[in-house]
Design a protein with these regions (language model features):
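Compositionally biased terminal segments of proteins
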Residues: 1-238
Length: 238
């Protein structure tokens, strides 16, 4: 009996996610890609096991109908997702081989559970850009939050994975925009996140994990320094 390798299974899962993103576009459904795939489109490709999209509230039923038609079922909310995001969302799951594929719909807004900050779909749309998502041999035009807004989401989420993404997104950032997008929710908690993230940037394990997740062979010290400067500047103004 033929057994797929772990890499083959992971690629099959990624291909399924790309297929679903394409099907949203073909169905003329409006959405903005956030999470790991948005980072891949704006910075450097990184492995992501699920797909997060922010959608207009009035299209929620159409998205759900399409996903059900494609064999997805309403799944249990993942703990990681639950820790990071609040607000209204629906999580859909399907198995590809023996690996689960998860599509998370953030309905009407993106809400940071840890800081109670909220960004409406309209706000995200007004601060989004078109980008090319490239995975393997596939490429796809998608709408994603501009870098500065994506960094703000990551600062509010405050997990180690988010800090790695911040490091990868810091090239050519507009500090004023990051500040504007970040200043919402419980600012005392935002300041705590920034202080914790600055401390983590001095941890060699974080740099090593950065290289692993993004498959970077070279020196990352410049990117880490840029991220530290960004967070230090935000500390002065938040």
């Amino acid at each position: 009996m033929f057994h797929m390798s772990w890499i083959d299974r992971a690629v099959a899962r990624e291909n399924e996610i790309l297929r679903i993103i394409k099907s949203f576009g073909k169905s003329k459904l409006e959405f903005i890609l956030v999470g790991g795939y948005a980072v891949s489109a704006l910075a450097r490709q990184r492995f992501s096991v699920d797909c997060d999209v922010v959608i207009p509230k009035n299209l929620a039923k159409k998205f759900e109908e399409l996903l059900r038609k494609e064999g997805y079922k309403v799944g249990q909310t993942k703990a990681g997702f639950d820790e990071a995001y609040g607000g209204e969302f629906a999580s859909f799951r399907k198995k590809v081989g023996d690996l689960p594929v998860t599509i998370d719909l953030l309905i009407g807004s993106l809400v940071s559970r840890g800081t109670s900050a909220s960004w409406s779909y309209q706000y995200i749309k007004e601060n989004s850009v078109n980008a090319t998502l490239i995975t393997g041999k596939e490429s796809l035009e998608v709408s994603v939050p501009e870098k500065e807004l994506l960094v703000a989401f990551k600062i509010h989420a405050g997990r180690e994975a988010d800090l790695r993404d911040i490091v990868m997104l810091t090239h050519g950032l507009d500090l004023g925009k990051v500040r504007k997008h970040t200043q919402r929710g419980e600012m005392s908690k935002v300041r705590e996140h920034i202080a914790s993230e600055l401390k983590s940037l001095n941890n060699p394990k974080v740099v090593l994990s950065l290289k692993g997740v993004y498959e970077i062979g070279g020196d990352t010290s410049e990117s880490v320094s840029r991220a530290a400067r960004l967070l230090e500047n935000l500390t002065k103004s938040t």
